[in-house]
Amino acid sequence: MTWDEKFNELFNRCFSAYVNGNSDFMSYYTPNDREFLASIGYKPRELFDFVEDLADEGLPAKSTALLVAAVRRDYFLTIQSGKTSPRAISRSDVPSFSETFEGFAYLPRIVAKAEAKLRGELDPDMMFGCGGDRKFLRENGEINPADFLRHVWAAAGDLSKVTEFVKKQNTTPPAAASS
């Protein structure tokens, strides 16, 4: 079975457990499941966040969860040589919701979260692809979260390059920061 088939099978099993009333996501995983998640650079909470949001909000789609996992896996195996980072980025380490860059509210925050997602450094209480991230991506050209991650990876820390990508996707002017 390929890694993506394993991911989909695990996602389906976790989704079923959650919609049937089990919110203890750590109970979803066997030792083999945890080993599999580690092999793709994923943490148990990362998968659960996508399961929970799909069950509770109808978004993001399972295919989005797989695409995001594919980007993380590629980064983990290619850039990190299969070695996890010991660092954890918390809410206080990322820019605020209202911080802007070149007129784009939230852009510095979502880029910081995307960079941490790529490195596997997001605190378990943070999610790349949360409602705020989805809102930003939707309002700026219906950008798929996995595409955004790949562009953040390619930008190699250059926020201007990410901004140019967002501008090309966006057919409306940037939303002003709300106070």
Where are the model-predicted features located?
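Polar/charged low-complexity regulatory segments
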Residues: 1-124, 157, 162, 166, ...
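Amphipathic alpha-helical packing elements
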Residues: 37, 122-166
